[in-house]
């Protein structure tokens, strides 16, 4: 992908921001990888939207959930859920299925950065609009989500926060139009092409250097 956000990722970020702003009950999911890489960035996004963050771990232990929840609060998280789950997502193993009413369980739009395909599919099967952040446009997560941002999480989340702030000034009808015009399949195809082009450029540059020119 290179060191910059691609045109396809920019399209997805705009659509994701519009979707989050249109949502009645949006929520942000934080797993262990997301907490390690982008806790501060996720807190900033939650703050811009004034919505909860919910801790959900693949390998859940009460101690790990508590540590991540505390980290998010230290970074300024106002609403952090996940320590006392009171519902479960159908179709997932018990620990993975745990969710919180008022958070992910009741959400109509959920952002799930760096998540696996099973969780993405299970949330989508509940009728939720799922926004993924995934470096692989061919992954099950990227394909099953409503919007997939194919970018590094450290670029994607701040860019999403910035778009939320920018688009929040627009009338609702403009946001609806943005979401309607977003073509998920087309954007994923574009992401694959961008990765291919980037790899070919790299290969040509390396071949050029190796030839001594």
Question: What is the meaning of each model-derived region?
Answer:
Residues 117-138:
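A short, gly/pro- and small-residue-rich
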Residues 86-105, 111-118:
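Active-site glycine-rich loop that binds ribose-phosphate moieties when present
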Residues 31-40, 59-63, 115-118:
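Gly/Ser/Thr-rich loops at beta-strand to alpha-helix junctions
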Residues 1-8, 29:
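Acidic/glycine-enriched edge-of-secondary-structure segments
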Residues 140-213:
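C-terminal functional extensions of proteins
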Residues 24-31, 52-57:
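Short glycine-rich or small-residue beta-strand-to-loop segments that form or flank ligand, phosphate
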Residues 44-96:
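Long, charge-dense
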Residues 12-26, 43-48:
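Glycine-rich phosphate/diphosphate-binding loops that line cofactor/substrate pockets in enzymes
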């Amino acid at each position: 992908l290179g060191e910059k956000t691609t045109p396809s990722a920019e399209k997805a970020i705009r659509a994701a921001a519009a979707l989050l702003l249109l949502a009645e009950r949006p929520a942000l999911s934080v797993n262990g990888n997301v907490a390690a890489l982008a806790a501060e960035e996720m807190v900033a996004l939650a703050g811009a939207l004034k919505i909860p963050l919910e801790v959900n771990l693949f390998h859940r232990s009460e101690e790990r959930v508590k540590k991540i929840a505390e980290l998010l609060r230290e970074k300024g998280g106002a609403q952090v859920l996940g320590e006392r789950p009171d519902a479960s997502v159908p179709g997932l193993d018990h620990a993975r299925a745990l969710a919180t009413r008022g958070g992910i369980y009741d959400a109509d739009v959920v952002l799930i950065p760096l998540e696996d395909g099973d969780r993405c599919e299970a949330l989508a099967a509940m009728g939720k609009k799922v926004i993924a952040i995934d470096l692989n446009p061919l992954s099950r997560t990227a394909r099953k989500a409503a919007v997939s941002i194919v970018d590094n999480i450290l670029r994607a989340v701040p860019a999403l926060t910035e778009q939320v702030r920018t688009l929040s000034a627009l009338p609702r009808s403009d946001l609806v139009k943005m979401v309607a015009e977003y073509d998920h399949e087309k954007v994923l195809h574009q992401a694959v092409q961008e990765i291919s082009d980037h790899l070919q450029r790299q290969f040509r540059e390396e071949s050029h250097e190796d030839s001594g020119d």
